[in-house]
Amino acid sequence: MTPTTLSHLRKRKQEKHKFATITAYDASFARLFAEQGIDVMLVGDSLGMTLQGHDTTLSVTVADIAYHTRAVRAGAPACLLMADMPFMSYATPELACTNAAELMRAGANLVKMEGGAWLCDSVRMLTERAVPVCGHLGLMPQSVNIFGGYRVQGRDQDAADQLLSDALALEGAGAQMLVLECVPAQVAKTISEALRIPVIGIGAGRDTDGQILVMHDALGISSGHMPSFVKNFLAAEGDIRAAVRRYINDVEQGLFPADEHTFN
């Protein structure tokens, strides 16, 4: 199987061919996802909640992410694999380089960091050292204590303008991709159209270049409250493989997210 690269995703954006991505944490699910057609995966710090049982992602370490990155890479050797940089693992550009190197050695193709224009020095330093970066704006789970909870971001004009400014700054610093989480659909559309790099949405409407879901949400096995922007694809299909194929199809056809999964 030909490995998926960032060049493939840039081409999809140019051709307006939407793509589905998902979180993965082990070799078995990574292999299953790859066999159904998922070719971009994220080893997310969401594992702190989905696997470790915590209320936030803040307890996750670089060693945790590296361990699961190695497992996912073993199961999906051809996928484009993103790895989250955990809380405080990129507080300085130098620290970001040290920790990103560990994740790249574990099998990641790029690292994802949460934050706006303040991250530009780190993004620039990593890019110059051959570490591709995916930015993350909007709702940033590592900032839950600043936000006061998990809330939609960018609903007023000033906040929306700041998101666009941060997105352009990250792209200018060398970011190769961007995740937008829990922002109004029109804001996400504006940002996606303004950037040359692929934009992946989660709770950001259907006009981003790609979509991502936490696998536990997509399969309806998350405990507690299910966010309004997710869909349980397993409920209708009754089979994990069929559910993943439905997720891919619905994203590619623009059927997911639907209006009920979108913020205005």
UniProtKB/Swiss-Prot annotation:
One of its GO terms (cellular component) is cytoplasm. Its cofactor is Mg(2+). 3-methyl-2-oxobutanoate binds at residues 45-46, 84, 112. Its EC number is 2.1.2.11. The keyword Metal-binding applies. Pfam families: Pantoate_transf. Homodecamer; pentamer of dimers. This is 3-methyl-2-oxobutanoate hydroxymethyltransferase.
